[in-house]
Each structure stands twice: as structure tokens, then as C-alpha cells.
């Protein structure tokens, strides 16, 4: 499979998160995104996925991730895996490649206060 950059859809999330999300694989088993962040996600509270795993590979910058009550300082080359059912919050400035498995489904993501 091959996707051109022009096939990706731009997105913006309040709090300073922007990026490109590529089409999900035909089998629906994964979605890939390139994410640039300068702020906090989510803007308030925490995010939680019911069934998607988010794998974040940091390309540049630095991020502080709070996942399931643990804190992780990410620097370029670090990989963070956020399993379903873990509330999380990410702050900082950086650029990452994010792999979401199975394919992204916004309905399974919740913002908790």
C-alpha cells in the first residue's frame, strides 16, 4: 500500500495539537498520523480510548505524558504505547508519528474531567 501526502486529512484539536491523518488500512487494522503539538492534549481533563491502542514515536521536541497515573518524559527516539482503558494527558512541544490500532474511531475516545 502507498499513500501520498495529499491523501492525508489535516486536523486541529483545541489546546495546540495539529496534524495529518492518513486513510485507515483497508482491513481497518490501523491508522497513521503525523502530529505536531505545542500545548496540551486534551485541553482539559484526560483522554481515554475504549479499544484503540495509540503508539507514539517522538521525532523532535519533548513531551510529558501522564498515562494511568505514571509520568513519562519523551525525547526524540522514544516510543510510548497507550493501551485502551488508560486515561492520559500529554503536554509539551514536539512532532511525532502516531500509529493507532485498530483503525481510529472517534466514537471510542472520551474526554474525562
Language-model features: where?
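Double-stranded beta-helix
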Residues: 2-3, 28-31, 40, 91-113
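Short, conserved beta-strand element in jelly-roll/cupin
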Residues: 36, 48-65
